[in-house]
Regions:
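Structural signature of tandem alpha-helical TPR/SEL1-like repeats
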Residues: 56-69, 91-103, 113, 124-137, ...
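Structural marker of alpha-solenoid helical repeat scaffolds
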Residues: 73, 107, 141-142, 175-176, ...
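Long, contiguous interaction/recruitment modules in multidomain scaffold/adaptor proteins
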Residues: 2-73
Length: 231
């Protein structure tokens, strides 16, 4: 477990060197809060949920048929295999998803998106070691893509490895500053590590970026509400 001070850092003096290989949780919070801005996200009325769900299922069936036809016509096109595998993933058919995604990695061993999607499937199956291996390969092939580092952070959090989670998530935040998902996951690491105040700051920032972020809002409610609104 990482022990952290809950004292607010002097954000004007904190700067994380690019050559650092690991970061403290306090530094992670400071970096995010320095660049935090608030924007208003668009939402959907609750009554539309069931309509959109039905529409989505119909669209996925059409998408599946489309990419199956493309793969049948040109079985050695890696991109089509990835699209087909990802569609199976969205439908919850992980066996077929992995089959086509792994074929894509064999067709093109340098195709980062293929490895990323393999990682997504393994993550859903809670095969975390295999997922980390896939995301790590994707990150090496596409080092500027924040998504691979974010997913590694998600898995490290699930495993209780908060130190490695913070390192991976800080890298994700470097590549895409201001991602509500990344900020939320660093908040998870903070909360699980015992830094409740830091977690509240991070969850508050995530909700400021995305007011419809349910998990972050639930986390804030659990910790006593948004940071700065205690009184």
């Amino acid at each position: 477990m990482i022990l952290m001070s809950t004292l607010a850092p002097d954000v004007q003096k904190l700067r994380i060197p690019s050559h650092e290989k690991s970061f403290t949780l306090l530094q992670a919070i400071a970096v995010i809060l320095i660049s935090a801005v608030v924007f208003v996200g668009a939402g959907f009325a609750a009554g539309k949920v069931f309509f959109w769900k039905s529409l989505e299922e119909s669209r996925l069936d059409q998408q599946l048929a489309f990419y199956k036809a493309k793969v049948d016509a040109q079985p050695k096109v890696a991109e089509d295999r990835v699209n087909l595998g990802y569609t199976y993933y969205l439908k919850g058919d992980y066996k077929n998803a992995l089959q086509h995604l792994k074929i894509a990695t064999e067709i093109d061993p340098k195709y980062a998106d293929a490895f990323h999607n393999v990682g997504l499937v393994y993550r859903e199956q809670q095969s975390y070691d295999e997922a980390l291996e896939a995301f790590s390969k994707a990150a090496k092939l596409a080092p500027r893509d924040y998504k691979n580092f974010m997913q590694m952070g998600v898995i490290y959090n699930a495993q209780g490895n908060y130190k490695d989670a913070i390192t991976a998530l800080n890298r994700a935040n470097e590549e895409k500053p201001g991602s509500a998902d990344v900020i939320y996951q660093i908040g998870v690491a903070a909360e699980k590590s015992g830094d409740k105040d830091g977690a509240r700051e991070l969850y508050t920032t995530a909700v400021n970026y995305d007011p419809n972020f349910k998990e972050a809002k639930d986390a804030l409610a659990r910790l006593g509400g948004p940071k700065g609104l205690e009184n």
